[in-house]
């Protein structure tokens, strides 16, 4: 499983490296200051390259002077956040990040509890099943099971995606407490991934009101052309979303109307997961 997310700067609430550049800028909610922020931004730059990177490349992309960049790199190397290949003179992400990513996943993830239910759904329905949690208004994919004949799509366990244009994201956003929901609506980037994407806060607010009434959400090719899904929230005993479940297919395999029949099955499994997770504490969305 790929436990890395887009942003090291926002390790617990980052964006994904292969989200379009326009959206990365639009969706960026916070920035960090000081030495720690600079170091984490540098980790982001290395991660974005998707390959070992030379000092000259980092310097070309860096807003910092050469001496500052050297100092940051030395610190990250000492902390094993970066590794250095002397022969190739390149930097890459360090193994300590893998350890931290796995630790974060174990400590705060619903995935270990929900795994048997996700497995059962995938076998029974033979469609792609997603498990996710909200992360600062975005979708953090915790687990994914492909159909026997898998459909290529963006999602992957460990990745973060937009909340406003995914079925599973909208299913969770809809059941947030009012003040948190309003804040999450304002946090969205509203980048138009497809011609079906919701691109403003008012339209999303209206959509979430409908989802609260119906208890389920749909992705109508809003994030990826040709990809559709039905999703439900996993609610705590207090009615707060601790996660979400979705069944995803393609328009070549099914029509959106065909997915309605799966909602009741997803709801049953969501309730089972909620009961199994009753004594666990997870970070608030």
Which positions does each model-derived feature cover?
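Short, structured helix-loop boundary elements
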Residues: 32-36, 90, 94, 107, ...
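N-terminal helix-turn-helix
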Residues: 2-112, 271-279
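Amphipathic alpha-helical effector-binding/dimerization core
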Residues: 87-188
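C-terminal regulatory/oligomerization modules of transcriptional regulators
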Residues: 2-15, 144, 150-156, 216
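Extended hydrophobic
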Residues: 197-270
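Cysteine/selenocysteine-centered motifs that mediate thiol-based redox chemistry or coordinate metal-sulfur cofactors
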Residues: 180-185, 189, 270-285
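Short, solvent-exposed cationic patches
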Residues: 164-166, 260-281
């Amino acid at each position: 499983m790929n436990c890395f997310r887009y942003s090291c700067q926002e390790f617990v609430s980052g964006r994904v490296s292969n989200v379009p550049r326009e959206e990365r800028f639009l969706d960026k909610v916070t920035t960090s200051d000081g030495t720690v922020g600079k170091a984490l931004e540098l980790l982001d730059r290395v991660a974005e390259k998707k390959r070992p990177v030379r000092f000259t490349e980092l310097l070309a992309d860096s807003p910092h002077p050469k001496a500052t960049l050297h100092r940051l790199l030395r610190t990250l190397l000492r902390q094993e956040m970066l590794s250095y290949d002397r022969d190739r003179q390149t930097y890459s992400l360090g193994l300590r990040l893998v350890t931290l990513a796995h630790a974060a996943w174990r400590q705060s993830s619903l995935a270990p509890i929900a795994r048997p239910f996700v497995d059962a759904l995938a076998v029974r329905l033979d469609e792609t099943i997603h498990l996710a949690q909200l992360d600062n208004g975005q979708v953090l994919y915790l687990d994914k099971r492909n159909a026997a004949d898998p459909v290529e799509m963006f999602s992957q366990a460990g990745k973060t995606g937009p909340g406003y244009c995914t079925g599973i994201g909208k299913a969770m956003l809809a059941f947030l407490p009012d003040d948190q929901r309003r804040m999450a609506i304002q946090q969205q980037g509203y980048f138009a991934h497809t011609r079906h994407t919701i691109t403003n806060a008012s339209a999303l607010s209206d959509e979430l009101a409908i989802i609260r009434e119906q208890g389920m959400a749909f992705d109508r090719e809003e994030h990826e052309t040709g990809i559709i899904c039905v999703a439900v929230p996993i609610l705590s005993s207090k009615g707060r979303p601790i996660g979400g479940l979705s069944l995803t297919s393609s328009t070549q395999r099914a029509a959106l109307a065909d997915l309605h029949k799966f909602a009741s099955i997803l709801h049953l499994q969501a309730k089972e997961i909620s009961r199994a997770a009753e004594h666990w504490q997870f970070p608030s969305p």
